[in-house]
From Swiss-Prot:
This is Large ribosomal subunit protein uL15. One of its GO terms (cellular component) is cytosolic large ribosomal subunit. InterPro entries: Ribosomal_uL15, Ribosomal_uL15/eL18, Ribosomal_uL15/eL18_sf, Ribosomal_uL15_bac-type, Ribosomal_uL15_CS. It comes from the Bacteria. The keyword Aminoacyl-tRNA synthetase does not apply. Residues 23-35, 42-51 have a biased composition (Gly residues). Binds to the 23S rRNA. Residues 10-19 have a biased composition (Basic residues). Part of the 50S ribosomal subunit. GO terms for molecular function: rRNA binding; structural constituent of ribosome. Gene3D superfamilies: 3.100.10.10. Residues 1-51 are annotated as: Disordered. Belongs to the universal ribosomal protein uL15 family.
Length: 146
């Protein structure tokens, strides 16, 4: 076998269908757009959510609620993720970010109680769940709200 004899596997490369190139091609004249009408024109077609003039669903349904501008979103960390650190480590939001456990700090870090903690750690975070607090102190570690 030589380089010039190489060919792609049968059926692995499909020829692009060129429309509007003669009637015998099967996609000539109207190019697969049917006869006249909005969808046959260039740039034709209806906008997203358009229902033919009927009041669309998003306008029939009443508005509800609002977005609270004062809401705080915390980066969540579970107890089993803290096992990545050595015994006696001081775990802070900066350390968590460097370790790749937290991507963005947001309004701070909240420690949740999912999983089991096996290390004795000093954890500094904005918030702790009650179960996380209990688990950290039970292992001889300490918590500090920052």
């Amino acid at each position: 076998m030589k380089l010039h004899e190489l060919k792609p596997a049968k059926g692995s490369r499909k020829v692009r269908n060129r429309v509007g190139r003669g009637t015998s091609s099967g996609n000539g004249k109207t190019s697969g757009r049917g006869q006249k009408g909005q969808k046959a024109r260039s740039g034709g077609g209806v906008r997203l959510g358009f229902e033919g003039g009927q009041t669309p669903l998003f306008r029939r349904i009443p508005k509800r609620g609002f977005t609270n501008i004062n809401t705080k979103e915390y980066a969540l960390v579970n107890l089993d993720q803290l096992n990545a650190f050595e015994d006696g480590t001081e775990v802070t939001p900066v350390v968590l970010k460097e370790a790749g456990i937290v991507r963005a700090e947001k309004s701070g870090v909240k420690i949740l109680g999912n999983g089991e903690l096996t290390k004795k750690l000093t954890v500094k975070a904005a918030k702790f769940s009650k179960s996380a607090e209990a688990a950290i102190t039970a292992k001889g570690g300490s918590i500090e709200v920052i």
